[in-house]
């Protein structure tokens, strides 16, 4: 739907400095400043996916920072985006959400320099993030090459555990594994971008492994093959998957 909406917007003037726009569904926009630096810009936010407000803030912030890492960049600055039902949520709960996000940013060495808050019917939290990347190290999701191997920076299974949580079937250990993985920074992306054999990057989030792999394959005009037995899967997620 979003692609259809974007396609009907007024045409924008071509700018050779815009290295990544919205055309290929990459994780962030990239704008070239000079031969040594390009600015990475992204924003990401969502409604709560866990009940604990601190964990919610941590997960949302990690997800937003991930978009910069996913194009090979290093985040340098964040702005908080918060829409909260002020007449329904206590100041303490809101503070925990913001603190969770701020802690993740502190762990990443990224200052939260400000932001914007509004009153809303449903809580929404996330970040607008600015990063830097060398123009020669930008990695897109549409430049994979035939013969490339698929490398995952995290174990899979957060979606399965989230589904179990929504059914009130997730045990404490499963919750721990889910949150620990969802709050692990994808900083490895910035390091992988420096390797000559790495041609494409993305972060595996809402669309799952298959959804994001299809995005890479379609954008690169390739097909991909995945061996289920080779995939790193969280132990708790494997257990819940086997239960059906």
What role is predicted for each listed range?
Residues 1-244:
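Helix-biased detector of long, well-ordered alpha-helical tracts
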